[in-house]
Design a protein with these regions (language model features):
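Non-catalytic DNA-recognition/assembly elements of restriction-modification systems
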Residues: 1-18, 32-67, 190-236
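A short beta-sheet element
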Residues: 86, 104-160, 164-178
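Sequence-specific dsDNA recognition surfaces
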Residues: 36-43, 57-74, 80-112, 132-140
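Short amphipathic alpha-helical segments
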Residues: 43, 135-137, 179-183, 203
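Short coil/turn segments at secondary-structure boundaries
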Residues: 27-28, 69-77, 164-167
Length: 237
């Protein structure tokens, strides 16, 4: 289900902001219905009339976290501690780690945008609340109404490939703010941004709810299976 929702979100972004067939004032697809397009020298392509193109770092900023010593790690939730988000946590919940909550830590909620700095550099992450490690960077939208548009922009194939390849071409192979500084982002009118934000927020909520339900089933399986195997529990016909 979540793969389908993610694919729908990607298709909607492509339809509205790459093909420019967002609904016009009559509800018809803008470009296909003859909407006015103008050449943009920065992007080297036509964009809808009235849109502007600005440096990416005018709509968002980059934030990093420090790396606490491993001696501070604990592996069960405890008061005064916060979850320590690592890249691997987006693939599995089997190595959950907690660290002391301090004022120096940057904390993210489940909707905030994170990005891999190493390995799969440029991959966009979200869905876990806590403090992120040094292998991740936070993308802070200056206007929260632009968060889903920014997330989709960064997740698009062209931008991901550009960031990943530009990072891999460097000697350290680490994504940082300088990679984002190269980007330019098209800015549609406010009404279109708000409409997109409303649709995508509903999708994100559904995705996170599905993740929670899936995790509950996994936890139940992990609790019940050992008891079934050693005979502590049985299933009645």
């Amino acid at each position: 289900i979540n793969d389908n929702l993610e694919q729908q979100a990607k298709l909607l972004y492509d339809y509205w902001f790459t093909q420019f067939d967002f609904p016009d004032e009559s509800g018809k697809p803008y470009r296909s219905s003859g909407g006015k397009m103008v050449w943009n020298e920065q992007l080297k392509r036509d964009i809808p009339s009235g849109w502007k193109v600005i440096p990416f770092l005018e709509v968002a900023s980059w934030e990093s976290n420090s790396q606490p010593p491993k001696s501070e790690f604990i592996y069960e939730p405890q008061e005064g501690y916060v979850r320590f988000i690592q890249n691997r946590d987006y693939e599995s919940n089997t190595h959950i780690t907690y660290i002391p909550l301090t004022k120096n830590l940057s904390i993210v909620d489940r909707f905030d945008i994170l990005m891999d700095k190493y390995g799969d550099a440029g991959a966009v992450r979200y869905g876990i609340e806590g403090a992120f490690n040094v292998a991740l960077g936070k993308i802070c939208a200056h206007n929260q109404n632009y968060r889903e548009y920014i997330r989709s922009f960064l997740s698009s194939d062209g931008i991901y490939n550009f960031l990943h390849n530009s990072c891999m071409a460097s000697t350290r192979a680490s994504l940082n703010e300088s990679n984002l500084a190269i980007l330019n982002i098209p800015i549609p009118d406010e009404k279109l941004i708000l409409g997109y934000e409303k649709i995508l927020c509903k999708m994100r909520l559904s995705i996170l709810k599905n993740n929670d339900e899936t995790q509950k089933l996994i936890d139940l399986r992990d609790w019940l299976l050992p008891m079934l195997m050693n005979g502590q529990a049985t299933i009645n016909d």
